[in-house]
From Swiss-Prot:
Belongs to the SsuD family. One of its GO terms (biological process) is alkanesulfonate catabolic process. One of its GO terms (molecular function) is alkanesulfonate monooxygenase activity. The gene is ssuD. Its EC number is 1.14.14.5. It catalyses: an alkanesulfonate + FMNH2 + O2 = an aldehyde + FMN + sulfite + H2O + 2 H(+). It comes from Paraburkholderia phytofirmans (strain DSM 17436 / LMG 22146 / PsJN). This is Alkanesulfonate monooxygenase.
Length: 386
């Protein structure tokens, strides 16, 4: 089971929908979160993309030297950048980080934002462009290992004598990740993607996605891995966790929720539509927003994209993660508000309950973790593992 964290380059806070409890989204803060994730044993971090956040490539590049083993899941944007430029950027990043790059393929689902970036095509055409983009991108980086040139002629994109002179460390190229819920997205994932990402829908819905994409991948003679993107609110007791969930949205008013939902409704993203359907755009208590045991839709009232959180005590959160893992999910990309503190909280409370997590961080005599020395002489008693 792989666990990733999240760099909140669009801002961070203790509350949603208000400046109260907010903190500056600046380099020092991003670095603190990245170093924490690296030290605590998270496999990697996701960096968001779009006009609502800082540029993912610039931020991720700035964090390479601050980390040792952390992987970076960074977006390429078919339709906005050329496949040749994206291939060179990926190769350089992979070389400078010694193979720590993962690629998040983002077609985009907000027509207003896409048009602002100069992209004026409909939903299915975006996926046609993405398909051709990935054919070129993959061929360029694969050919870079043998110093060969490539040709490709498509309906939307072409390359004649394309060449990447510097190959990536990962062969043939950094792994491709992607999330999308439409039939066109599933077909594209089946043909090109190494790890398919879903937002945190209830297990039955996730199982249907996995089955469909596995079948599409098999039709292309491929196998594919699966990941899920979720927020997490974990506390030592269930009561504390649900109180924290209520507190997170306690500053929201109806106007803020309405404005956010109106913005989301203009998108042509099937995934965003499915997120909105979980809460119906209406604030409520646990009874209204707990859409499956320990799965809470409150975040999606004002946050685009991933809008659900696992809420509960450590055992409940771990049990729900294991339930998703039994469906075929092997990577969990998590986040919590505020992101620095919650990266520690989750690692401390839940990592010991997950398979293959105990030895991710060195526990040698000088590195701990063992707590503050007692009486200037003794290590604290070891915590019970039961």
């Amino acid at each position: 089971m792989n666990v990733f964290w999240f760099i909140p380059t669009h801002g961070d806070s203790r509350y949603l929908g208000t400046s109260q409890g907010a903190r500056a989204a600046d380099y020092d803060y991003f670095q603190q979160i990245a170093v924490a994730a690296d030290t605590l044993g998270y496999e990697g971090v996701l960096l968001p993309t779009g006009r609502s956040c800082e540029d993912a490539w610039v931020v991720a590049s700035s964090l390479i030297a601050a980390t040792k083993r952390l992987k970076f899941l960074v977006a390429i944007r078919p339709g906005i950048s050329s496949p040749g430029l994206a291939a060179r950027m990926a190769a350089t990043f992979d070389r400078l980080s010694n193979g720590r790059l993962l690629i998040n393929v983002v077609t985009g689902g907000d027509a207003a934002e896409l048009e602002g970036d100069g992209v004026f095509v409909d939903h299915d055409t975006r996926y046609e462009i993405t398909d051709e983009f990935l054919h070129i991108w993959r061929k360029l980086l694969t050919a870079a290992h043998t110093n060969d040139a490539i040709d490709f002629e498509g309906k939307h994109l072409s390359s004649k004598g394309g060449k990447a002179l510097y190959p990536p460390v990962q062969n043939p190229h950094p792994p491709l990740w992607f999330g999308g819920s439409s039939p066109a997205a599933h077909e594209m994932a089946g043909e090109h993607i190494d790890t398919y990402l879903t937002w945190g829908e209830p297990p039955a819905a996730v199982a249907k996605k996995i089955a469909d994409i596995r079948a599409r991948a098999a039709a292309h003679g491929r196998q594919i891995k699966f990941g899920i993107r979720l927020h997490v609110i974990v506390r030592e007791t269930e009561e504390e966790a649900w109180a924290a969930a209520d507190k997170l949205i306690s500053k929201l008013d109806d106007e803020t929720i309405s404005r956010a939902q109106a913005s989301f409704s203009k998108m042509d993203s099937e995934g965003q539509r499915r997120m909105a359907a979980l809460h119906g755009g209406k604030r409520g208590g646990r009874a209204e927003l707990e859409v499956y045991p320990n799965l809470w839709a409150g975040v999606g009232l004002v946050r685009g994209g991933a809008g659900t959180a696992l809420v509960g005590n450590p055992e409940q959160v771990a049990a729900r993660m294991k339930e998703y893992a039994e469906l075929g999910i092997d990577t969990f990309i998590l986040s919590g508000y505020p992101h620095l503190e919650e990266s520690y909280r989750f690692a401390e409370l839940v990592f010991p309950l997950l398979p293959n997590r105990r030895n991710k961080v060195s526990n040698g005599p000088l590195s701990g973790p063992f707590g503050e020395i007692v009486g200037n002489n003794y290590l604290p008693k070891a915590a019970s593992s039961s």
